[in-house]
Amino acid sequence: MDDNRLSRRAFAAQAAAIGAALAFGRTSAQAKPAALGERRDLFPQGVASGDPRPDSVILWTRRTPDAGVAAHRLAVEVASDPEFRKLVARGDVAVTAATDWTCRFLAAGLKPAREYWYRFIDEQGHTSRVGRTLTAPADDDDRPVRFAFVSCQDVTQGALNAYRRMLFEDARRPREEQLGFVLHLGDFIYELVWYPEERPGGMERGRRLRGNVRYPHGEKVSTFHTPTDLDDYRTAYRGYLLDPDLQDARARWPFVPVWDNHEFNWRSYQSQQIINGEIRPAQKLKVAASQAWYEYQPAQVRKAGTGDVFEAPVVENRPVETFDARGVGQEPNNLAAINALQIQRAFRYGRNVDMILTDNRSFISPGGSYSGLPDIKFPAMPDSMLEILDQGRAYDGGHPPATIRLGELEFPNPNKDAPPEAYLGLEQMAWFKDRLRAARAPWKIWGHSFGTLTGRTDPQNLPAAFADQWPAGAGYGVTTGAYRLEHREIFDMVRAEGITGLTIVAGDRHAFWAGYPSSDLPPRAYDPVGVEFVTGSISAQTLGEVQQLTMPRDRPLRALSIHDRPDGSMETSWNMTLLHGVKASLVLKETGDPAQARAARNPELSPHLRFLDYAGHGYATVRATPDELETEFVCIPIPLERSETDDGGPMRYRVTHRVALWQPGERPELRQAILEGDPGLAI
């Protein structure tokens, strides 16, 4: 049997596994001369491509029947030129109500590191807009790898100007310097939707509500609405994909998506929702959320069933009461729901990058109890207390204390019998470690939805007048820093096995972060094992924005969160509080001089952080060569309304972080440069 027939069999198996129609490349195919007319109204959510490989890419569209012109099958054309004079692949795919009129198409047999154009054609000859896509370089291709990573786009109360900026800049670069793909790290949709007529002035926390997502069913929880079935989730994706800037981005680059929490439910674990503080079994809803994600994301992921459509497993909503050693519920309906779609995957991108993507939400543990803990006014948790609570029954090798001491306080340990805080699960953890060990590219990039970097500050150094804010002897306070058992397992393995080039890219935090992941921080042993970068949100509201809108001016210690300038403007000093300590932010309040404030820094506080901006919107790009990796933060102002200019509007700053590939036993070292604008208190 010849290699071509073997390749066809392999691609057919691949297409079947991911539920996509297949077209195998034909370099001699010519476009038919039939007159074709573009009808974007018949393809209202545009076109997209995803998960590029050296020889294939997934293509996607939605051909709606709502315009009065029905279609049952679409032809798909892939060409090496935007005029479609030279076709390289052609096939057809069904569109049915079973997939909400979406379709997925695996264009295979393509050449590596190539630019292609594609379109969909209905039975009447109407065409979609033309999409552009790119294949990955071959495994031995050492050209620089360039990609963007993004997260947290909320089109119901913000504009996607960050995509406009990305599109504008990329189109003006030489071909060899353009982005190869966009890594979307989750919160592609926000399932929480406020309806403008239900909020004062049609506003929510200073943002204009668009009303562009309205659930056909839904449930009102507090002041917002959430999905209750598959139709609701599909409605959210349809509404989001009407955004012109998101459509343009998906038409220009292949996307590589994973999900975060909002694709299912913002407060949930596995298949269980938390509504008004009560746990609600939601196995059916978890399956529905996974199906909608699968239908609207062009990703090479494994789904339930073997056919071309998502075959939803039959599940019942049941409480989850029994958990394994990492907190994964063993109730059969829960296991079926969380495994209905497996988005964790790994791929090589040229010679310089091994990409590993994990599912950080489907297997996340329930979270421990925080009942009976002392009331602390300061917005942080004592690090020593979190160290015990976070690890649950696994603390100290399975010997957690019955009580926790915090200075002069002592109280029962509510988590001594609970599973540890974890999010990968035992099976995915083993898979991840195997893939990390097997990675041979210089840069091992972990696509992580929410990141591992710890945020902490030093309220123990507050002036005596604020002693009531923090328990005596409590030490450092942590704002984010859970899942320590899993992180130590991974980072200790990286250190012990001499793995270099570990790079974590993340989202979720609505903030820009740059730093070094480490198993521990001072006064415990600090030994970084890699570098980590977190991108700001595309449009979702930041902590800095919320603080400036809601924090009273007479609130004690306001200066730790907001720096009030003499001219009446405000800046997020929470960045300085976490980077340099409470004394630095208090000196800033007194002097107004960032240099004097940084001179008062606590050097033990955050040696793992080089950059932090809790008021940053935008995106990040990565450039990876054999011996260096560069990450650039592109920050824009709050995107309240869509920019009227093609460049997406003004910039706040552009900052790069470079790191040379380090050797086993060495520590990575980030080098920072401000290329444009002023990041202010973020450094």
Task: Give residue ranges: language-model regions.
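N-terminal secretory signal peptides and thylakoid transit peptides that target proteins
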Residues: 1-19
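Long, structured stretches of catalytic cores involved in phosphate-ester chemistry, encompassing
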Residues: 14, 28-683
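Hydrophobic h-region of N-terminal signal peptides that target proteins for export
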Residues: 21-25
